[in-house]
Amino acid sequence: MLGSAPAMNVSSITNNPVWAILFWVSFYSWFFVFETWVSMRDVRAKTTIDNTDGYSALFFWAMLYTGIFLAFAFAFLAPAFRIDSDSLNSLLFTSGIILIWVGILFRLWSIQTLGKYFRTVVLIQDDHKLITSGPYRYLRHPSYTGSMISVLGVGLALGNWMGLLFILSTVCIGYRWRIHVEEIALKKRFGSAYTAYAEKTWNLILFVW
């Protein structure tokens, strides 16, 4: 029965079927609907490319799936790490749902700004240009920032500190390698222009990295 909301039994606040529906709609909208659309853009693209991905996409997805699995496992199977305070859990849950959608919109903005140059694998196109407008004015990899915001939202909404730690840690490891590979490819393509651009921008998080 929907009223029992067993799948979201991570705290008292998430036993509410309205909260359960809100979480699952948000999670599926991000992880399955939106990210499937992002992947389909690559399938439709027909551009001569220099693929320098080096399996970084595969590594990232492996880390993301691992993080999501651990986050849900801790949320459902490790009550010792659950947030017992209803008021705090309510705040974190609400913040988490908001962040999932903020991340989706920020990633969408980044993808639309990059246009045809956005791909889910690291590659250089024949007519590749350095985009420095929109979110790329301040961040070199803002689409990843959007994903991180959504990941943070999922972790907060699940209401388990250990799950939050693991999902953030694994995704950070995945993006750390991905960005390393991508930076090498972009520096090779754009040379000093990219070096100058990198000196006045951040990788993923403003004022942090």
Describe every region a protein language model picked out.
Residues M1-Q125, L152-W209:
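Membrane-anchoring alpha-helices and their flanking helix-loop junctions
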Residues V121-S147:
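Active-site-proximal inter-transmembrane loops
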